[in-house]
UniProtKB/Swiss-Prot annotation:
Subcellular location: Cell membrane
InterPro entries from the UniProt entry: AAA+_ATPase, ABC_carbohydrate_import_ATPase, ABC_transporter-like_ATP-bd, ABC_transporter-like_CS, P-loop_NTPase
Source organism of the structure: Clostridium perfringens (strain 13 / Type A)
Binding site for ATP: 40-47
Role played: Part of the ABC transporter complex MglABC involved in galactose/methyl galactoside import. Responsible for energy coupling to the transport system.
Protein name, per record: Galactose/methyl galactoside import ATP-binding protein MglA
EC number in record: 7.5.2.11
Alphabetically ordered keywords of this record: ATP-binding, Cell membrane, Membrane, Nucleotide-binding, Repeat, Sugar transport, Translocase, Transport
Family the UniProt entry places it in: Belongs to the ABC transporter superfamily. Galactose/methyl galactoside importer (TC 3.A.1.2.3) family.
One cellular component term from this protein's GO annotations in UniProt: plasma membrane
Gene giving rise to this polypeptide: mglA
UniProt cross-references to CDD domains, sorted A to Z: ABC_Carb_Monos_I, ABC_Carb_Monos_II
Reaction catalyzed: D-galactose(out) + ATP + H2O = D-galactose(in) + ADP + phosphate + H(+); methyl beta-D-galactoside(out) + ATP + H2O = methyl beta-D-galactoside(in) + ADP + phosphate + H(+)
Amino acid sequence: MKDSSNLLEMRNISKEFPGVKALDNVTLKVKKGSVHALMGENGAGKSTLMKCLFGIYHPNSGEIFISGQKVQFKNSKHALDNGVSMVHQELNQVRERNVMDNLWLGRYPKKGLFIDEKKMYDETEKIFKDLDINVNPRDKVSTLSVSQMQMVEIAKAVSYNSKIIVMDEPTSSLTEKEVSHLFKIINKLRKQGISIIYISHKMEEILEISDEVTIMRDGKWIATEKASDLTMDLIIKLMVGRELTDRFPKKDHIPKETTLEVNNLSDAKNELKNVSFKLRKGEILGIAGLVGAKRTETLETLFGLREKGSGDIILHGKKVDNSKPFKAMQNGFALVTEERRQTGIFGKLPIDFNSIIANIDSYKTSTGLLANERISKDTQWVIDSMKVKTPSQKTLIGSLSGGNQQKIVIGKWLLRKPEILLLDEPTRGIDVGAKFEIYQLINELAKEDKGIIMVSSEMPELLGVCDRILVMSNGRVSGIVNANETTQEEIMHLSAKYLSVTGGVNNANQIKEKV
């Protein structure tokens, strides 16, 4: 007997791959017109379960019911045709085509033998109006922001008359304002009777938007609870199988003498304005700020990815030329970029290649071939020292969890023995258990006297991991505070300091450091 309030029932789903049981007897029940969150550490089986629903994988055992009818989708098109859509974390759009082309690709409305562009435009406009999406259907996708691209993908799901929409990490690249807009759209869909399966690592969002939460661990169902009955601590305990009494490791590194000085750094576009600070050996310096504060741009200018306009970068008392990334690398700098999948890894290549790519020239022999024995040895060092969970050095890095991918990205730089590590959103898209491991790793690197500069949009992370926090506002330094003494309120106040300023350059000497 199927519960009529459940739009979707996935019963006793199991899925095996060679040597791995990815799903073990998992049951998921989703009510009509509800937001049902799916949580678990990376590798818990969330994506595999959704791929079984969406027809990408076929379960070895178990049954799927939609509106009481048993279904078994042959592929994703079959799922779409039957009202199941999926908005992937990695947006799959043809960037050089316009918005409405992307919405109706492969199923254009026809007028005789020709595409009915007017109908396509009108249908797109109607969906956008219903969802309060402010995008011109004729705009090229390449001109849209990440948030707008996400909204277009949701509109596409709605255009299939979907009853169930799976959203995989939909807010990973969105601002707070954009998240608020997304939640308004989700609430509209909920009122229309559409069920949302919402996958996210962001517990605050889960508790705000969800009706029910299902938690998975190691391919198994652990619990399904009303969101109103859950706390962050309970979610963490259910996800990792133990209590995390502290979200952050103890800061047991001791900053020493100054190793890096940045004086009046501006970029060639003058988006950075006279940025000045000091970094000590064995110190973790956070960079906080609102969207548009130019935090990433600061790291890119330090690393030579962005052209410097003026100012000095001084390492060990001597000016260094970081005008190009290869020069920055030679000077002992390393950059872990924000968008790991786009700029940090080669997803379709194995771990060993990704581990040595930042230092690949050093592995060439006199004959021009690669020294495979040394590559294997160094790759194993990365796997062991970073505590990477993988069956083999030859495993494709794209198949690993986000946390394990990030460990390899950091490890590849450590093979170069850098002195200054620039980390841009190092825990983005990583589950709570893996985050703790990354924090421990950063702490260990500080104990080895590395100077670390870390950009993060998560205020608790900056306060819990860093020694000091440099706050930026509109491309300027608005303050430098002691992480153990400051508050989120003070950081937010400093983040807004120069938002109304349109001209003039801030004098770095007027900035007070709280140390």
